[in-house]
Amino acid sequence: GIIHSSLGGSEIAAWLPRQVINANNSFRTLRGNHWLDSPLISDWVRGRARKNISPRLNQGSPDHPYKPAFLYESGIAWTTPLPITGVIWYQGESDAEIIDNAQNGMLLKTMISSWRKAFRNPEMPFVMIQLPRINDPSKIRAGWPEFREMQDTVAKTVPQVYSVNTIDLGSTNADVHPPFKRPVGERAGNTALNKVYGKKVPCEGPAFKAFKTSGSSILVQMEHAAGLTTTDGKKPAQFEIAGTDGIYHPATAEITNRKGGTAVIRLSSPEVKSPKNARYCWNRFVTPNLVNGNQLPARPFRTDAPVLKK
């Protein structure tokens, strides 16, 4: 069975145990009413909370669902005696307003480690839904590409954490709630079946492995790419390349050198004579068409990502 514990718009801070917040000096601004001015909390969340509780602020420290530790204490803490196998984690739309991979990654990894300790399971699996696409031009959605990257980085560096790609399933409008719920659940379920229960169920889409420059082209090697193709029969879309100036331009992409589970994509653009870097689906809203033989979409990536501390 599945125990459902969630609240729309909540940030990771609300899901952290209070003792973790109190013990970590990096979280000092999350304590008491300081959280309403904390740089670790997005403007939207702080604004919504102030609107809800401002009449009672002078009476002490009123609770709010977005308050740090509130959702952990009111929900997760009560389930820690249960033999939970793992967690399906779908959250981050509010955190992504703060474009800081180091900060968001630190919060996410802290939450994962604290839950594992609370459940007395140091390897408790986390199946994490990567933020999908959203067709919303507002400022608060600008950091979604970076947040997706952070989620993938955590999945690559923290054992038993898995990132579920949903880049093709989000809204074609500004609705933060993706309309296509079933495929999200199926991908999360298949990831759990494969990674946690050892079932031979496809769950990996094409993912960046390596790249190199070749004259006026960039060659991108993809893994989990058996049967690599496009859903519309056209060339792969949403690729961009940049030269030394760092300005990205749309790239023509051609699938080459399919071999086993890997394939190479050649990228070029008349605007970039000497390319240095490439990226894929690096925007809040994209219309991707690149999939493998299991019809699972390719993961967003960029080759010039900053190196973050583990």
What are these regions, as identified by a protein language model?
Residues 1-310:
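Cell-envelope and extracellular/periplasmic
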